Amino acid sequence: MEKYVVVLAAGKGTRMKSKLYKVLHKVCGKTMVEHVVDAASGINPTKIVTVVGTGAGEVEKILANKSDFAFQEKQVGTGDAVMTAKEALGDKEGATLVVTGDTPLFTTDTFNELFKYHAEKGNAATVLTAEAPNPFGYGRIIRDNQGNVLRIVEQKDGNPDELKVKEINTGVFCFDNQKLFEALKHVDNDNAQGEYYLTDVLEILRNNGERVGAYKMPDFSESLGVNDRVALAQATKTMQRRINEAHMRDGVSFIDPDTAYIDADVKIGNDTVIEGNVVIKGNTEIGSDCYITNGSRIVDSKIGNGVTITSSTIEEAEMDDNTDIGPNSHLRPKAIIRKGAHIGNFVEIKKAEIGENTKVGHLTYVGDATLGKDINIGCGTIFSNYDGVKKFHTNVGDHSFIGAGSTLIAPINVADHAFIAADSTITKDVGKYDMAIARGRQTNKEDYWHKLPLSKDKDWE
């Protein structure tokens, strides 16, 4: 059986009170519509068609390699939205999954179970349902005495008895494709909203003698539709718990999983430990046997094995195996920390490579520089890379020693085995085995204390 998917993503989402198109709001680093399309892709469909509306260019850009598109000019109901996919799917044989783009928690497993049930029962239509603790706002599943699905009644159209029903429509359906598009021709907008409801297709099919069924999924939380910021936060919390549990099952330890925020595409190796209040975002990859302490933030970075990150921020950077950083340090974009290097506290590194086993201990800025291996950078060193117009590069060779409080004014080259005395301001290249001293000479004034006003203060005697 060929499988097809229609994703409904044309809604404006006015309750989000946002300039951003509703399905583009993110849940754990991915837009809601990406979550839906990725879950649907897991069933290996022949084609996915995403229905978009005015101003949906960003949706098309994000899903360009994952979906075809249909355009709904006016948002006049889910039935009309699905009908826009007729040109792409109307003549196809097989089954079509219809799902909304604002339901990011659905899983591939649930979609597979729905298709399986649909095929086994020989249904023309199967609705995915769930038992809701509080069904307010959802369409209710109305069954006959034998348990067969008669219709779905929307909140604003239901009578008191119908609204007591707790089995709800999740907004996900599986249809015989050709019967779906034939039935859509007969859907009207005679309802309180004046819209063309996709749910009316079920009653039309049933009246035509077709078999209509329902598959009740066990986990109601998957069906959460995001219509406002409250629901967005709920979806994020649920997704975060799911992500963290998956990592724990794969051998990652979380000290406090409730406060660790990990994006959906993050990869983490086994035997890594993550403390609470840690944020890991984007396409970050973290190796095995790492330790990440509270307050750390890692974005779009690659972390090797055996790395320790202590309360530090890492953005678009790389840390090789057996390196460490922190506390309170910052790797900015294009920072590369080679194997065995040590980055201490209050260090900022930007667009610089730190060589193997090099130590940058504390209170240092390294920008636009290449440092070799086995170098010691003293406390308070500054790599001065900007003249107000352009940025310049500094090179420091292997086995060099940069004394505390030094300033290296780019562009300069410091050769291998060079020594820079503390508190020097270096403006010229330093040769191999050379020592550079660039500071004022010390002068001692004998007995100068007694010339100071403080010398007459008894507390200072």
From Swiss-Prot:
Gene: glmU
Keywords: Acyltransferase, Cell shape, Cell wall biogenesis/degradation, Cytoplasm, Magnesium, Metal-binding, Multifunctional enzyme, Nucleotidyltransferase, Peptidoglycan synthesis, Repeat, Transferase
Residues where acetyl-CoA binds: 385-386, 422, 439
Name this protein carries in UniProt: Bifunctional protein GlmU
Residues annotated to bind Mg(2+): 102, 227
GO terms for MF: glucosamine-1-phosphate N-acetyltransferase activity; magnesium ion binding; UDP-N-acetylglucosamine diphosphorylase activity
Enzyme class, broadest EC rank: transferase
Free-text remark on how the cofactor is bound: Binds 1 Mg(2+) ion per subunit.
Signal peptide residues on this chain, from the entry's feature table: none
